A protein has these predicted regions:
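Structured soluble/peripheral alpha/beta segments that form catalytic or ligand/cofactor-binding pockets
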Residues: 16-343
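Bacterial N-terminal signal peptides
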Residues: 2-13
Length: 343
């Protein structure tokens, strides 16, 4: 689950008559082809987050995300500039040691080479922000006014498919789901500015046409990379009345790399402390696996603010402590106003 306010805001303008596919059980995943664009689904994203440090112990969290929103029409116009897909990207950097958080966003239509996610090119890009693939190794580049990074991500485990029977179900009803693939542990090396850094990253890729139900107004999503080589993805969907949706779920990847689906009743997320309206400290329990940990933001203010659309959300680097230790990322949406995906 990821949120892009601007993408959601502009999508109704481009609504067309093209019949997009639904995310349905039994999807026949084919890698590496499925790591790239799926233009027969309406919405898609590639999401990178990581925690790294330099030789002196200076800590950073980084995020680079590419989004595609389909706006296809049944049209005979073959011009390369006809809007078929809109690509949005954002890059963010948390300087945990210096207590700074920066966020940048860019929007482009696909056009002739401006943005895309090409299997033929083995590349996902928006302008000069990019993820270049060589096998499963992914090299990230982003340049902004305040920071730049060049990072190579090497997976330590094969990609996993989240959910059950090929879909991550988000609500009751046919097609209210996504196809969801993760690289839960990537070893990182490279540079942030002039600092050489190493660490761990997580990569998500989702594609779908419709997900949320009307009563679902937001979510809390965790990636967890524990020092014992256990990884977790957990999300809770929230209703208007504050209730947790029964389609909330997760995945535990054991130290051998095997993925185990977690249903709503198999984990507990309990908010402990807030920064403004956002819970920035949580207790996380997975009783069946003996996990009882606390998530704490490395910097409280990691809110991504979008004044134009008034759809702010929080996403940033966290530490985990308790009976296990580790690092990860947390995303929280719908605390200011409900989140909506367009149909």
């Amino acid at each position: 689950l990821k949120l892009i306010p601007l993408l959601l805001a502009i999508a109704p303008v481009f609504a067309g008559s093209f019949a997009y596919r639904e995310a349905l059980p039994g999807y026949p995943y084919q890698f590496p082809r499925d790591h790239f664009e799926h233009q027969d689904f309406r919405t898609e994203w590639w999401y990178y987050t990581g925690n790294v440090s330099d030789a002196a112990g200076k800590r950073f969290g980084f995020e680079l995300v590419f989004f595609r929103q389909g706006e296809r029409h049944d049209s005979d116009n073959s011009s390369a500039w006809v809007a078929q897909d809109v690509y949005l990207a954002h890059a963010a950097l948390t300087d945990a040691s210096g207590k700074h958080f920066w966020y940048y966003e860019r929007l482009n239509r696909a056009g002739p080479g401006v943005a895309g996610a090409s299997f033929a090119k083995q590349r996902i890009w928006n302008g000069n922000w990019a993820s270049q693939w060589s096998g499963d190794t992914q090299t990230l580049d982003a340049i902004t006014d305040r920071f730049r990074f060049h990072l190579t991500l090497q997976p330590e485990t094969p990609p996993i498919v989240q959910g059950e029977n090929g879909v991550s179900q988000k609500a009751a009803g046919k097609g209210r789901a996504s196809h969801y693939v993760s690289f839960p542990l990537l070893r990182v090396s490279g540079t942030i500015g002039s600092d050489a850094v190493t660490g761990r990253a997580w990569m998500d890729h989702e594609w779908f046409t419709e997900q949320l139900a009307p009563e679902q107004v937001g979510w809390d999503w965790f990636s967890v990379q524990l020092d014992d080589r256990t990884e977790l993805m957990l999300f809770e969907l929230r209703h208007k009345d504050g209730a947790v949706d029964p389609y909330s779920s997760g995945t535990l990847i054991d130290s051998g790399g095997k993925a185990h689906h977690l249903r709503r009743g198999e984990f507990v997320l309990q908010p402990l402390a807030k920064w403004h309206k956002y819970p920035v400290e949580w207790r996380i329990q997975v009783p069946g696996w003996g996990i009882d940990i606390t998530s704490k933001a490395v910097l409280e203010d990691q809110e991504l603010r979008d004044p134009a659309n008034k759809t702010n959300y929080w996403e940033g680097a966290v530490d985990y402590s308790g009976n296990r230790r580790g690092v990860g990322y947390l995303e929280m949406t719908g605390y200011g106003q409900p989140v909506r995906f367009v149909k």
